[in-house]
Amino acid sequence: MSAFDLIVRGGTVVRGGCEVADVGVADGVISAVGPDLEGGAREEIDARGLLVLPGAIDAHVHFNEPGRTRWEGFASGTRALAAGGTTLCVEMPLNAHPPTTDGESFDLKLAAAKASAHVDFALWGGIVPGRVGRMEELAGRGVAGFKAFMSATGTPDFEAADDLTLYEGMQEAARLGLPVLVHAENRQITDALARRATSALRTTMRDYLASRPAVAELEAIGRAILLASEAGCSLHIVHVSTGRGVALVAAARERGVDVTCETCPHYLLFTDEDAVRIGAAAKCAPPLRPREEVESLWEQVLAGNVAFVTSDHSPCPPDMKAGEDMFRAWGGISGCQSLLPALLDEGYHGRGLPPERLAELLSANVARRFGFAGKGGIEEGNDADLALVDPSGEHVLREEDLHYRHPISPYVGRSFRGRVVRTILRGRTVFEGGRVVSGPAGRFVRPQREKGER
């Protein structure tokens, strides 16, 4: 009888450092890591010349199900994740209809995800006006935390949180022992500048970029940190687009505030000039920034002040990206399939980011922050979630390579150094040779988190 169900042989295993080793898997769990494992296996994979990374964890995706599967859906969205080396995602509460703001809406989303997810998943709940009293229902069902917007959401059925709603939501999250995630932009500034531009018929990409200045983000980050520190909750700032924003978070951590932040590949790879060149496919909020902001953000990533990198995959149908009016175009970037490839290309190859830091930014830190036990690292007892990467494999991303419902992405046409060749979920290959090779097998992951864990 074989000692293992699977052995991944001879790859460069990334865990703390890098070592050429085998990974033995039994019953979907990593049971041994070391050179020349003995005992045999029912399946062996030759990983010589490949990086063996923990499967990425994308803590920020919008799959729009139930109710808006014309936009994406768990089936196509998680196929794209598998193709990009991601084995666990956390799906956002807005854009679905109904949004995830109470127990009933959670149940609908959970059923949809269980039926069609190709990778494991967790779910965020929402903080919106009039629904703070329903947060306990969501906590009891296993949400990973709660998301709030400080600026307009673009979705009428998920309202932005006014300051009192945000503060009281933070107090409730603290009581429940769960984190609050905040989209931090000052709504008064962004709304007023947008009205000024559109009333003057200034609706180009440059006009849109100017309507969401960095100061709107910086002010909101500072305000969110203050409210969270007073409420006593764990705070996470999503999609920070400036190095100065990260610096505010780092300074607050030095003062003892329980706060972390993420950024996204599009803020690390693209500039405002790219947004002008690409058009609506590159519209997002906060927007893409000038080159000096990109460099400052990379400095913070390399200094260790950014906890992790997420895709903020936010797709829509093609008609919502059509036209020349950038204020009307949907503000979201499709990019979850490119999360790991983007960091391999620009981080590992372009900036000298070591593989072990790549694993921290895309896996370990996410699992630790949000309490995903058994995830995020290649260690005995953890789920056998692996991404096998050819670090020298170059490719140009084409529309036909994308697994999204709609092949719209600013990454199309970009050359990447580093290719995901196989994705393994709990010991089972789900992506290989450019194809998703298994049916929906994703499981719901509940957080196991102690209050104050950082």
UniProtKB/Swiss-Prot annotation:
Its EC number is 3.5.2.5. It catalyses: (S)-allantoin + H2O = allantoate + H(+). GO terms for biological process: allantoin catabolic process; purine nucleobase catabolic process. One of its GO terms (molecular function) is cobalt ion binding. Disulfide bonds: none annotated. It is an enzyme of class 3 (hydrolase). Zn(2+) 2 binds at residues 147, 183, 239. Pathway: Nitrogen metabolism; (S)-allantoin degradation; allantoate from (S)-allantoin: step 1/1. The modification N6-carboxylysine is found at residue 147. Binds 2 Zn(2+) ions per subunit. GO terms for cellular component: cytoplasm. Its cofactor is Zn(2+). Zn(2+) 1 binds at residues 60, 62, 147, 312. Carboxylation allows a single lysine to coordinate two zinc ions. Homotetramer. Belongs to the metallo-dependent hydrolases superfamily. Allantoinase family. This is Allantoinase. It comes from Rubrobacter xylanophilus (strain DSM 9941 / JCM 11954 / NBRC 16129 / PRD-1).
